[in-house]
Amino acid sequence: IDVFYTHCDALLTTDTWDIYFQKLPQGIQTQIMRFKRWQDRHASLLGKILLLEGLKKYGYPPDCLKNLSYSPYNRPFLDDSIDFNISHSGEYVVCAINNEGRVGIDIERMRPLDFSEFRNYMTSEEWNMMHESPDQLEYFYELWTVKESVIKGEGKGLSIPLLDIHWEGETASVSNNLWYIRKILIDPGYSCHVAANHEISELHTHKV
C-alpha cells in the first residue's frame, strides 16, 4: 500500500491551479468546480492529483483518470487490479493506493468537540474506554478514523452504521469482513488510519 499526502494551507497560484487542472479529464474538472468553497475545490483537485501521481507509479498512463467508473454507491474505481481512496481534513489531503485488495483511508484534524453529540455512534465499551483514556480527544479521533477508513474501504457509503464496526488493535470487523488497520503519522494535530481487507505487509508514505 502506498499513501500519498500533501499539505495545503493557502490558495494555489493561478498558474499552479491551471497546470494541475489541465491534467484532469473534463468530467472531473466539472465535479471540482461544483464546490462553492475554495478549500473544497483545492482539496478535490489535490486529491485527484495525488491519485494521478500515485497511479503513475503503478504504470498507469497520464490520462488514466478518463477511464474512472463508479460503483452503485458512487465509489470511483479504475479496474480490478488496483484500489484507491482519498480523504482530506484541515490542511492535508491523503490518497491510499493498493494493488493487493481493497483500501480505505481517513484523516481528521483533532479539534475540540462535545463528545456527548457522538454518544449514539459509540458502543458502551467504546464510550467507557474513551473516558478512561488519558487523552480522550485522541482516543475519539483514533476510533473515528479507524471506523471511517473501514466504511470507505467497504465502499457502501453511509449504509454501514458506525456501531456495527468493532475495532480491536490492528484489526476491525464489520458484517463478517475482517479489516487490517494501520495508523499513519502525518501531523501530531491529526489522526489518520488506513484499512485493508488483507494483512498489510508493506506500507509506504510519500509527501508530495
Positions of the model-derived regions?
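Core catalytic alpha/beta fold that binds nucleotide/phospho-ligands
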Residues: 1-208
